[in-house]
Amino acid sequence: MKKWTNRLMTIAGVVLILVAAYLFAKPHIDNYLHDKDKDEKIEQYDKNVKEQASKDKKQQAKPQIPKDKSKVAGYIEIPDADIKEPVYPGPATPEQLNRGVSFAEENESLDDQNISIAGHTFIDRPNYQFTNLKAAKKGSMVYFKVGNETRKYKMTSIRDVKPTDVGVLDEQKGKDKQLTLITCDDYNEKTGVWEKRKIFVATEVK
């Protein structure tokens, strides 16, 4: 009996060690898989754009947001925050955000004065979507690649708003074009709720 008890304790100990190792490694594995997936999608996007341009050298098609929600519409790069993410069509539903960073609204246009893009923030995954956006500051550069265009922006405003404050999505007539980047902020460990939204506004550099 004692022999079996010792064996069971040994097995239980091994299982606990394996579970602990898995829990420790999981965020790193998830980050690796996410980075690999997004890099492949960005590479494929650039390849598709280049192929399309070579087919139609005389007339460069104006970049458009795909109607297919699973297609990449472009990608955003923020060097100061070590962010480079493919951007998907809106709206930023849970399903779309599972694919990746996406336009906040369904009717978003690349010609809008205020282009809004939303992305997740995860506590234990620093490389995931907009988690590290907090490393950006006023003056940080933002690059938005759509088709053959690389649009340049500079961070001009960073602030918190309530989740219900949808005014950040509004067009602002008479003002320079801008990107509005949206992610979660102020995580409440007791309720498991992100109580605020962090808003990063980047104004186009002409």
Swiss-Prot record:
Changing residue 180 to A: Decrease in catalytic efficiency. One of its GO terms (biological process) is proteolysis. It comes from the Bacteria. Changing residue 108 to A: Retains enzymatic activity. Shows reduced Ca(2+) sensitivity. Residues 49-69 are annotated as: Disordered. Its EC number is 3.4.22.70. Changing residue 120 to Q: Almost loss of activity. It catalyses: The enzyme catalyzes a cell wall sorting reaction in which a surface protein with a sorting signal containing a LPXTG motif is cleaved between the Thr and Gly residue. The resulting threonine carboxyl end of the protein is covalently attached to a pentaglycine cross-bridge of peptidoglycan. This is Sortase A. It comes from Staphylococcus aureus (strain NCTC 8325 / PS 47). The gene is srtA.
